[in-house]
Amino acid sequence: MHTNVLCVVTAQCAKHPDKVYQELKKLGAEYMQFIPCLDPIEGDRGVMPFSLTPDAYGRFLCKLFDLWYDDWAKDNYHSIRLFDDYINIMLSDAGQSTCSTCGRCGTYFVVEGDGSVYPCDFFALDQWKMGNIGKNTLEELSSSEQAKAFLQFGQQKPIECTDCRWSPLCNGGCKNDWERSGPPHNHYCNALQTFFAYAEARLCMIARAELQARRTY
């Protein structure tokens, strides 16, 4: 049985990437996902005790990558979805990346306890309610005005992505990480730039190794 673990990165968690990674491996996690914790919808980001700052997230990603890369080099690979995504994009295999890195949102049927349906678990908000699973068909839900509006929203990119050297990898990041007011901007933009500058050479090395392995299959 394969085990997939979703880890929410808080301010406290970000201080101990080595402990987090090793403990997840001890649990038998073969597939790992790390996402920044959510601040309350109302209010400023970064003011809660658990809030994850861009600087802390950048340091966390760099250290986590060191640990992950060391395992990969020892032929002890564990999947970390974010890193896998970047390698797939480098291999021009963007179809294997997820919505948080491909630059556009899809529409998923997220069903709440009362039957309400939303296009994404991060956007289970009244403005994006597509309908109700007990009252609407799947066709009606997928063709709803909210679904269409969400797909259009999901095509946007921050203006600073236009001239960013990392844009082909990052694609603006997950829309959930964007600032909640003002023009589109990823709250963790600096964290991602720090990470790419730190890990680029080794990401390329892994991508080349993966490409060679595929050619020998």
Enumerate the language-model features and the residues they cover.
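Flexible mid-to-C-terminal extensions adjoining Fe-S/redox cofactors in radical SAM and related proteins
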Residues: 124-217
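Radical SAM enzyme [4Fe-4S]-AdoMet core and its adjacent flexible, acidic
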Residues: 2-104, 110, 124-130
